[in-house]
Amino acid sequence: VVAEAPARGAVFIVTTERCPQILCRLLGLIAQQDRLVARADAVDTRRVLRVMLAVPDIDRNRATIIAGKMRQLVRVRTVKVRIDK
């Protein structure tokens, strides 16, 4: 019996200022790396927007590149990345 290799992936947790365009910009950065988002969640707290994006089948290098680009967006305050091995 051959065991399947565990799926790699990353979860991005992003805190931003409230901005109508930020979700499209975050998703666009992931699309530029030719990846799809498996799950997304956004919570508006009236002060900030908290966004969670789960991206399967992505390696650590690409996830790091995306996180760096997210941090460069003007409205983004924090970016945390959890890499699943």
Which positions does each model-derived feature cover?
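A conserved regulatory-domain signal marking ACT and ACT-like small-molecule sensing domains
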Residues: 1-85
